[in-house]
């Protein structure tokens, strides 16, 4: 927060001119760097690194030093910092979409070496080598983002698996295990996109509206705005969780949606794996998701290709149709291998009109998957036609 306020003051006081930290650095960085290095135990080493950085890359290095978390400023390996700046600037110079990025977008959404609070890895050069060939023929940000998103599973060899070692894995940790949580997968995608000059950021919610769990995903910036996507690409602004995101609660941290920012915002990103931490800067984006979800629902219904489908779980077949016999259960919905939705069914104390309902494309075969009372995976498969449909499952 202090450095954020310093920036506002310094922009007014030092609108032009050079920095005493070296040529290529605007003067308004001086008070920011002064504040960042004032109590840093290796300030001299960082100043030396800044002097040794090529002039064309020096502002990028200064920007990172100005906003780095104190822990990184004190301990992050300087060769990692140097490599990160070198490859980020190389990508900006090489790719046509990166050349036209506003400085503010490049600095905060391409340059940073971390997506959230993961271990700091030397991923930038490795990912540049992996993904630069994927975008060699692309001409726009959207084309390049889609090319990376479609190829990432094959190029990093990581799959979703709850047996992963920890939630917030770094790229190297995930690739070593060949598995990651949604958090680890999102870190991989953010870094892969950034490696070739594509603005990307980590997004998530501590819990959905029904408290059935947290989720993380990725946003990509193109055409002047943010678009959501996931590690397993199904299209931009298309995801199984959109209906849930549309029910997120504005201003309620436990059920809101946040995006990570490297630069301070005056707010923080809630880390479900480290609930007491305030170390990651964030910005709430709940309202945008609510508005997008509502507009998407109206569009799907107006198009006539989708129909409402409700799913209810009862204790036994004899309980069907009773309020008291309903069971709250987490449900995932698939069309073939693709997840198209998810939610939590209504329990016995909820209003009869309150239940798990989603829009599904007509003339499709869908599977509702949940765990029964014995902890066994249970599936109910139905054919969805032209009319609204109610589907039931049983715990016993």
What are these regions (language model features)?
Residues 371-396:
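Structured interaction patches on ligand/partner-binding surfaces of diverse proteins
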Residues 13, 148, 178-203, 218:
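Cysteine-centered nucleophilic/redox motifs
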Residues 44-177:
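Secondary-structure boundary elements
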Residues 161-162, 195, 206-211, 216, ...:
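His-Asp-centered catalytic microenvironments across diverse enzyme cores
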Residues 4-13:
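Sec-dependent N-terminal signal peptides
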Residues 20-33:
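Mature N-terminal, pre-catalytic/accessory segment of carbohydrate-active enzymes
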């Amino acid at each position: 927060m202090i450095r954020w306020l310093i920036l506002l003051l310094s922009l007014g006081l030092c609108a032009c001119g050079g920095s005493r930290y070296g040529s290529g650095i605007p003067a308004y960085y001086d008070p920011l760097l002064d504040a960042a290095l004032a109590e840093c135990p290796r300030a001299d080493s960082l100043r030396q690194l800044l002097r040794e950085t090529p002039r064309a890359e020096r502002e990028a290095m200064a920007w990172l030093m100005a906003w780095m978390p104190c822990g990184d400023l004190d301990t992050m390996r300087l060769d990692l910092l140097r490599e990160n700046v070198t490859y980020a600037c190389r990508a900006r110079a090489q790719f046509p979409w990166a050349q036209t990025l506003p400085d503010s977008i490049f600095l905060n959404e391409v340059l940073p070496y971390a997506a959230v609070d993961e271990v700091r890895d030397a991923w930038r050069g490795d990912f540049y080598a992996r993904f630069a060939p994927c975008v060699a023929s692309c001409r726009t940000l959207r084309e390049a983002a889609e090319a990376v998103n479609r190829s990432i599973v094959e190029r990093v060899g990581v799959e979703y698996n709850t047996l992963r070692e920890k939630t917030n894995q770094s790229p190297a940790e995930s690739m070593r295990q060949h598995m990651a949580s949604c958090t680890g997968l999102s870190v991989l995608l953010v870094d892969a996109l950034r490696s070739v000059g594509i603005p990307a950021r980590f997004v998530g919610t501590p819990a959905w509206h029904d408290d059935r769990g947290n989720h993380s995903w990725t946003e990509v910036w193109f055409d002047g705005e943010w678009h959501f996507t996931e590690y397993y690409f199904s299209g931009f602004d298309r995801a199984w969780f959109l209906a849930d995101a549309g029910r997120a609660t504005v201003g309620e941290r436990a059920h809101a949606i946040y995006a990570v920012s490297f630069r301070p915002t005056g707010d923080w990103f809630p880390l479900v794996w480290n609930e007491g931490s305030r170390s990651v800067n964030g910005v709430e984006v709940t309202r945008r998701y609510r508005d997008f979800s509502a507009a998407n629902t109206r569009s799907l219904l107006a198009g006539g290709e989708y129909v409402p489908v409700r799913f209810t779980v009862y204790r036994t077949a004899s309980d069907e149709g009773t309020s008291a016999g309903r069971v709250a259960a987490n449900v995932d919905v698939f069309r073939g291998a693709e997840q198209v939705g998810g939610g939590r069914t209504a329990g016995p104390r909820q209003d009869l009109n309150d239940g798990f309902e989603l829009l599904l494309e007509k003339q499709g075969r869908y599977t509702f998957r949940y765990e029964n009372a014995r902890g066994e995976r249970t599936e109910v498969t139905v054919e969805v036609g032209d009319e609204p449909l109610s589907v039931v499952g049983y715990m016993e």
